[in-house]
Curated annotation (Swiss-Prot):
NCBIfam families, A to Z: minE, PRK00296.1, PRK13989.1
Family assignment from sequence similarity: Belongs to the MinE family.
Keyword line: Cell cycle, Cell division
Protein name per the record: Cell division topological specificity factor
Organism taxonomic ancestry: Bacteria, Pseudomonadati, Pseudomonadota, Acidithiobacillia, Acidithiobacillales
Pfam families: MinE
Amino acid sequence: MSFLDYFLGSRKKSANVAKDRLKLILAHERDADGPDFLPALQEELLAVIAKYIPVDKENIKVSMERRGDFEVLELNVLFPDQH
């Protein structure tokens, strides 16, 4: 390995590391914003569920996350006890 190859080779490695870090930062910022439609979706789901079961708005949580190549929409509903 020559003197120039040593320095040129390290630049490629550091460039790849910087590129990977930038991808992580951009992905994190993209996820932090969240989809704009989630509040409206939560309201509509509450209206549909309320037709059949009385449930409070605070008991419905809608979230979206990325898992690999997929985006997963998660819906958690806490139903009231039926005594």
